[in-house]
Amino acid sequence: MRVQPSVKKICRNCKIIRRHGIVRVICTDPRHKQKQG
């Protein structure tokens, strides 16, 4: 899980979602997981 000021899609499987006001990237590749913080 990477915490970044701005989250971006890395590959075509990445999806940007909002959970409880936190922007996250979920992907089939675990290295692509990101969280905005």
UniProtKB/Swiss-Prot annotation:
Alphabetized GO MF terms: structural constituent of ribosome
Pfam family, one: Ribosomal_L36
InterPro entries reported in the protein's UniProt record: Ribosomal_bL36, Ribosomal_bL36_sp
Keyword set, alphabetical order: Ribonucleoprotein, Ribosomal protein
Gene Ontology biological-process entries: translation
GO cellular component: cytoplasm; ribonucleoprotein complex; ribosome
HAMAP family: Ribosomal_bL36
Family, as annotated: Belongs to the bacterial ribosomal protein bL36 family.
Protein name from the UniProt record: Large ribosomal subunit protein bL36
